[in-house]
Every structure is written in C-alpha cells, then in structure tokens.
Curated annotation (Swiss-Prot):
Transmembrane stretches, start-end: none
A UniProt-annotated Pfam family: MutS_I
Keywords, ordered alphabetically: ATP-binding, DNA damage, DNA repair, DNA-binding, Nucleotide-binding
Protein task: This protein is involved in the repair of mismatches in DNA. It is possible that it carries out the mismatch recognition step. This protein has a weak ATPase activity.
Name of the protein described by the UniProt record: DNA mismatch repair protein MutS
A GO biological process held by the record: mismatch repair
Stretches the record annotates as Disordered: 809-835
Family indicated by similarity: Belongs to the DNA mismatch repair MutS family.
C-alpha cells in the first residue's frame, strides 16, 4: 500500500484496527454507514452486490471503498457469515459532534459462522453450534456451544470416526482449534466445509469458572476453557446465559454414523437436500422454535435405556388419550415465542422492546399450560409441571414498563409506557406542550401574514423553521424573520419566539430519549437476573412440545406403541415406511411384517429392482429410531429389542472428495459395520458386492453374511441379486429367506410390494429395463442372452450352500473369519476341491458366442502363480476385508 494512503489520521486508525482482524471483513463506522476499504471493498462489493467506488478518487492511488447503511447492516452481515466469512464490526465509541480530534473507534464484536445470533425465521428450529477441539495423544477433547440458546456440552472422543460423526451431526460451521490438532485432521475437517479458527492462548477467566466446575476430566475442562476464551475474545460481551458445561458420552445413545443418517434421510432428503421427505418432516408438528430444535436433537440421539424410552412413551400415550386437552395445549404453545433465544439476547444486550413484549406474552401462557397438564388424570407430567415457572415478576415488570407496540430501536424513544417514571412523564408533557405551542404559532403566523400555506417544520440540521414559498416572500413583515435556509421554491426562517421554544422542546426530547434508554437498560438488567429460570422453563416447554408432536403424528397416521424387550425377539406386524406412506397420501400403502426370532440373525431379501427391498430395510430402521426416541411406530403391532447401533450400506455413491470408487466406499462402509457392530446392533446391507465382478461380489457377499451370522450375531437385513446365496439357508441356521413379490400379467411386470417367505424365483431385470423405456431391440437381445446364460449356469445355485457345508464340516473356530468361495480367486479356471464349484460355461457347436460376457481362461505364468497362491491361502484366518484386498492384488497381477 502506498505510504501516502496511510498518512491520514483516519487511515492510520483503520489500519491499526484492520491489522488485528486480517481474516475478517472490517465494517468501519463512518456516520450513518459502515464502510469497507481496499481488498475488503473489492471482495465485499462482489459478494454483497454493492457499488464499488473510491475514496480520494482524484489522488494518485485512490482507495477502493463501498458501504452499507447502519440500519440495514445486519442483513449484509448475515450474507457474508452464511457464506463462511467473518465480519468485524468497528463502531464509533463517542458522539462525533463531541469528539475532540479523531473519533474513537473499537471493534465491538467479531461475527463468525459459529457465533452469529441473528437467525432468520427459516432457521428458528435449527441450532447454530460453535465447536472446539484439542488433541492429546490418541484422544480428542471436544466441546460445543450454541450462543443463541446457552447450550454448552463436552466429551472426550477416542476415534477419528467418532469425531467426524459428531461434527456432521451437529452440522457445525466453525471449529476452534489449537496447535495440537494435526494438519491431516485439519484437512479432513475442511473437506466438510467447516471454518477452522485458531485460539492458542488461554488465560484464566474467574468470572466464567462456574461453567466448568462440574467437569471432572482435565481434557474436557481444557477444551471448554479454550472455547470460552474464543467466545470472550470475539463477542466482547456478557456470557451470563451460557449454561454449566455438561459432559456427555456418545455411547449413551443409539449410534448412527453420518452415512446411516444420510441413507435413512433423517434430516435431509437425498434428492433435494431439504427437510421435506424426511423423518424430521414427518414428525415435526411442534409449535415452538425450542420444540423444533429439541426434536432434531432427539432424532439425532435416540435413547438406549428402556426406562427412559418408556417414560416418553407414557407421556405420548397420555396425550393421545386426551384429545381436547391436547388441542388446548397446542393452542397455547403457538403463543409461546423462542424463550431460549430471547434469554440469549437479554444476556448479550441485544434485546429490544419488541423482544421483551414477546417474552411477556410467552410467560403469560405458562399458567394456562400448567393448568392443562395438571388436569390430566395422570402424574406422568409432574416433572414438567414443576418446571413451568411463569416467572411472574419478570412478566409484570415488562407489562408495567414497555409499550405493547414497541419500536425496534431502543435509543430513539417510544419504548417506555406513560406513568412508569414521573420524570419521563414531565419531559413528555414539556414536549407535548411545546408541540402544541408550535401548532398554535403556525396558525398565528398564517393569520398575521395572510400566507395560507405557511408551515412550521423540523429537521435535525436546522431545527424548527418557518417555511414560505418564494411567491409569498413579499408578504412577510420586515426585520422579524431571520433567514435560515434557501430552497429552490421556498425560504426557511426563524423568529426569536420560535428559537426560545425550540431549545426547550429539543432539551425535553433529548432528556426524554436519554432517560428512556436508561430505564430500558434497568429493565433489561433486571430480566437478566432471571435467565436461568427462563432457560429451565424453555427446556420444559420444548419437551412438552415434542411430546405433543409425537401424539399428533401418532394419531394422524395410526401409529402404535411398540413393546420394548430385553430379548432379541423382533416382531412387527403390518409395518409401514412412515415417510413413504405420508407422501403417497390417499394411495394404498402395502404393509409388511418383519419377524426375527432370538435365534435368527439374517433376513436374506431377494426380488426385482424397484420392488421395494430398500424401502423395506429403511422401514425397519426408521421404526427402530422412532421407537427409541419415544414415539409410536407405523405398524399394527410392534415388539422390538433395544438396539445400540444402526449401520446401513444402502445406495451407490462415489466419494468424490477422497477420490474413492463406489466399490471402495461400499467396502469401507461394510467394514465399518463388521468392525463395530455388536449382537445388539441393526445392520442393513443393500446389494453388497454389486460394484465389482460377479464372482468377486458374490464371494464377498457370502463371506460377509457368514461372518455376521457366525461371529457378530447382529440383526441383519441383507438384500441381494445373487440368487445363488439363497441356498445358504440350508447351512446357516440363523438365516431365513424372504422375497418381495412380483408377477407377470399379459407380459407386463406387476410389483406386489409384499414381502413373502422364501427366495425369489426371478429377478425381472429385463422387465425393469422395459419400464425404464429402453429400446425394444435391446430388450430382445437381453432376453436372448439371459436365456442362454440361465441354461449354462444351472450348477451355480448349489455352490454357496456346498461351501458353507464344507466350512461347517471343517469346524470353523469361533471368532475367526468365515471361509471364502474358491471361485473368487479365478473366475474361469476350475480348481480341484472337495467342494463342488461352478464350472465356466462352454459354448456348444452352433450356439451364438456371447462375447460380451464370456471370460477367457488363464493359462499363462501369472495365472499359474495366482493359482498356486490360492491353493496355499489360509482361508480360515482371513476377514472379508483381507479377502477383498487379496482379490484386488490378484486382479492387478492378472492385468484386470
């Protein structure tokens, strides 16, 4: 930057401030505008669609600049913060009229993606979490806070996967770190679109020590202190609304990793990325912003303690049994504003008169809500009733002090009620009498001069004035009117009388405005003392709101109360996918049973594409989640065990960020389940193995099924197009075949969407292609190829069962990896074995060569070497991932 640019006092002040916030847009207050200069102006003008101009445009090096009006600044701040930027607000700390020399300016707040408080109506039901992370050896200290609600929690995480799951669950936009966080982890966090902020220095804050006094783990205390330090440095205001830090353990809840939440569409639709079409969309009949946020938290963290779940169920059942009371409750809840965020604004000093009126209105509904709940013929809501403190002292204070239709500004007057303060009433009388005198003077001057359009007005520059059009100037008496301003078509004057009363009126207005602000500040500080009571109240109202929402949805869609058992018995009669059912509306939804005895581990699901296999699997997972958050479930009846984790491998998606293929993503997600699932987990595997060669895929699918069946024992739904795997029920006692029915009518495929016992007899793939509109000639060719293949591969169906039987005969030891089919190593070369395997199809004379599918035999040296390695392979000691890796090495060696 040229030295001349820095020489002016204002520019020196600007750079002194800007150097403290190099990574933020600096909004520099100049009069009624916030200005940006240099690179901030160039980039800000582009992002905010502002006109870029220059300061000192005639100079050798004009300064790029742009600005926004101070009254509209919040909108522009929100735009930048939503785009992931920080904004430093540099305010004038003294009245420019009274300043001696350069006006003093300071940054009063650094607004960041994780600290912004002003959320629009569309985000009222969404938390905005600021997170913090420190790394010590193999452990992570993790904390998060929502500055708008005061929530503050912390945990010690032991794995990278758990950390990433927490970050994605919280949907955090900003994380505070120190030097301990490794660069590779930082890079991984950045790929999630999270802004990384540094806070390396932490100094003791005695005034905030109470927030960490209940923490017993050093790592948790350290990370919370770092988070609080960052908040203090950036926000520069009271944090009285922050609640004491609560330590939590992710394992205390049903674990759902990011992929499972995505695949099950809990919060966002896969297709649109929006709320509609999700479980949240279905269940959200909440009437308050607090209730909406709590509902998301419950869906994100289902319970695993039977007594806690049943407590929620009892409350939902009670509300279901009392329709009229529930309707009255809903009506009162609609009148309750966002108590949590109103309390946050009070603490931050950003609350206005309108906010306080909303707080009063909300508090006035609490006695009515208490009465409705106390009238229920049950004691299940006793805890909530006891927490419904109407905070009457605060409501009465606001009612006495603040006008009903309060303005947004608290510095321009008009906020305090008449009669609240005697001195204020006197000032207002002086103002009103003065204005009455002005009106009388205007009438008198018109009569004296004979000028009918003479008027008395006011502006902040010239004060009160008498305005006369130029056509009537000759009618004014001489020597009594003092000219103040000349306009195009008029002149403005003053008189000695007007001047004397003007000073009295303006003095009264000034004193009145100043006193009003002082009174408002006292009211705000009194309300501030009740923040903890307001937060306790908000939590109770939020819980009541979510429970009534469950009751409404359960009644509207005929949900039933699930019976929770400690056994592994799972029985759902006429279960439904709740979201699909809602989307279908009046169309008939085909319900299905899901039954698995304690000894049954795997349901192997076959059936054509588009028949509903994936929907059936998701349906079970959503039913489990709904049950464990305390809601009723979509079924005629339901008996469920309590699950500790849900794993899903549904859909085909490349990981573009990591550059990984669909198959690699599939294997990693499957491996995650195999490594971490327990006998109390629910596992959903959809079409495992479809991303690789046929025999490779089938080999892996069978090995995974056997591994889950023999060693994990988790309840598993496994859908597949490998019909050969259906023979596994002959050897795996805990596996049962089911299929989704379909039939042909007049050559057309009709999906029955009904899950029936046994394996599917056909996959109907060509029929589905026909439904997709593929060319007739292509479909005819596909049918011809299909017939030939079915004739040639009739022996394959016995392979899976015979391999499983062979393994059983060889007494596979518990806790060792399941065996692999030998054809996985060399798809076309028969290998001597005690177990019969599928032979490579050989075309008979006269048959048409199916060159698209036929695979050449391996007879070269590389193939022989692979064959020898296969013969010596210790299959009994290999995991499915070991097998996958070995197959990959062989494929590379064979040039595939």
């Amino acid at each position: 930057m040229p030295q001349k640019t820095k020489d002016t006092p204002m520019m020196r002040q600007y750079f002194a401030v800007k150097n403290q916030y190099p990574d933020a847009f600096l909004f520099y207050r100049l009069g009624d505008f916030y200005e940006m200069f240099f690179d901030d102006a160039i980039k800000g003008a582009q992002l905010l669609e502002l006109t870029l101009t220059t300061r000192n445009h005639s100079a050798e090096n004009p300064i790029p600049m742009c600005g926004v009006p101070h009254r509209a600044v919040q909108n522009y701040i929100d735009i930048l913060v939503d785009k992931g930027y920080k904004v430093a607000i540099c305010e004038q700390m003294e009245d420019p009229k009274l300043a001696k020399g350069m006006v003093k300016r300071e940054v009063i707040q650094l607004v960041t993606p994780g600290t912004t408080l002003e959320r629009g109506a569309e985000q009222a039901k969404t938390n905005n979490y600021l997170t913090a992370l420190i790394q010590r050896d193999q452990q992570y200290g993790f904390a998060y806070a929502d500055l708008s609600t005061g929530e503050l929690k912390t945990s010690v995480l032991t794995t990278n996967d758990t950390l990433i799951n927490e970050l994605t669950s919280l949907q955090t936009k900003e994380i505070v770190v120190d030097d301990s966080v490794a660069s590779d982890l930082r890079d991984q966090i950045k790929t999630l679109g999270i802004l990384i902020s540094e806070q390396n220095n932490v100094t003791p804050q005695a005034q905030l020590s109470y927030l960490t006094q209940d923490l017993t783990v050093d790592l948790e205390q350290q990370v919370v202190e770092r988070l609080l330090m960052y908040i203090t440095v950036t926000q520069k205001r009271s944090l009285a609304h922050l609640q004491k830090a609560i330590a939590y353990e992710p394992s205390y809840f049903l674990k759902l990793d990011h992929n499972s939440k995505y695949n099950l569409e809990l919060m966002k639709s896969i297709r649109t990325g929006k709320k509609q079409g999700t479980l949240l969309w279905l269940l959200d009949e909440t009437k308050t912003a607090m209730g909406g946020r709590l509902l998301k938290q419950w869906i994100d963290r289902p319970l695993i303690v039977k007594a806690d779940i049943e407590t929620r169920q009892n409350k939902v059942a009670t509300l279901l049994d009392h329709y009229f009371e529930r309707s009255n409750l809903q009506e009162e809840l609609t009148k309750v504003y966002d108590l949590e965020r109103l309390a946050g604004r009070v603490a931050f000093g950003s609350v206005n008169g309108r906010d306080l009126v909303q707080l009063k209105t909300s508090l006035r509904q609490i006695p009515k809500i208490r009465y409705i709940l106390s009238e229920l013929d049950t004691q299940v809501f006793n805890d909530e009733v006891n927490q419904l403190d109407p905070v009457e002292d605060v409501a009465d204070l606001i009612d006495a002090a603040i006008v009903e239709d309060a303005p947004l500004s608290v510095t321009d007057g008009g906020v305090i009620k008449d009669g609240y303060n005697e001195q204020l009433d006197q000032y207002r009388d002086a103002m009103n009498n003065g204005k009455k005198w002005i009106a009388e003077l205007e009438a008198q001057e018109r009569a004296t001069t004979g000028i009918k359009n003479l008027k008395i007005g006011f502006n902040r520059v010239f004060g009160y004035y008498i305005e006369v059009t130029k056509a009537n100037l000759a009618q004014l008496p001489k020597d009594r009117y003092e000219r103040k301003q000349t306009l195009t078509n008029a002149e403005r004057f003053s008189t000695p009388e007007l001047k004397s009363h003007e000073s009295l009126i303006l003095e009264a207005e000034s004193h009145s405005t100043d006193l009003e602000y002082q009174l408002f500040t006292k009211v705000r500080e009194t309300v501030k003392k009740a923040i903890q009571r307001l937060q306790t109240l908000a939590k109770a109202v939020a819980a009541i709101d979510v429970l009534q929402s469950f009751a409404v949805v359960s009644e509207d869609y005929h949900f039933v109360r699930p019976k929770l058992t400690k056994s592994h018995d799972l029985k759902i009669v006429d279960g439904r996918h709740p979201v699909v059912e809602k989307v279908m509306g009046n169309q008939s939804y085909v319900p299905n049973n899901v039954t698995m005895s304690p000894d049954e581990t795997v349901l192997l699901i076959t059936g054509p594409n588009m028949s509903g296999k994936s929907t059936y699997m998701r349906q079970l997972a959503l039913t489990v989640i709904m049950a464990q958050i305390g809601c009723f479930v979509p079924a005629k009846s339901a008996q469920l065990p309590i699950f500790d984790q849900i794993f899903t491998r549904i859909g085909a998606t490349d990981d573009l960020i990591s550059g990984q293929s669909t198959f690699m993503v599939e294997m990693q997600e499957a491996n995650n389940a195999l490594q971490h699932a327990t006998a109390n987990s629910l596992v959903l595997f959809d079409e495992i193995g479809r991303g690789t060669a046929t025999y490779d895929g089938m080999a892996l699918a069978q090995a995974i099924i056997e591994f889950v069946h023999n060693h994990i024992h988790a309840k598993t739904l496994f859908s597949t197009h490998y019909h050969e795997l259906t023979a596994l029920d002959q050897e795996l006692s805990g596996l049962r075949n089911v299929h989704v029915g379909a039939t042909e009518q007049d050559g057309e495929l009709v999906f029955l969407h009904k899950v029936e016992p046994g394996a599917a007899d056909k996959s109907y793939g060509v029929h589905v292609a026909k439904l997709a509109g593929m060319p007739t000639s292509l479909l005819e060719r596909a049918n011809k190829i299909l017939t030939s293949l079915e004739n040639q591969t009739s022996t394959v169906s016995t392979t899976a069962a015979s391999i499983a039987a062979s393994d059983a005969a060889n007494s596979v030891a518990p806790n060792t990896a399941a065996s692999m089919p030998v054809e996985a190593a060399d798809e076309s070369q028969p290998v001597e074995s005690e177990t019969p395997v599928a032979e490579a199809p050989v075309a008979e004379a006269g048959d048409e060569q199916l060159s698209l599918f036929a695979e050449p035999a391996v007879t070269d040296a590389k193939g022989e070497k692979v064959l020898q390695q296969l013969k010596t392979l210790n299959l009994m000691a290999m995991t499915p991932m070991d097998v996958m890796n070995q197959l990959y090495k062989w494929q590379q060696k064979l040039g595939k």
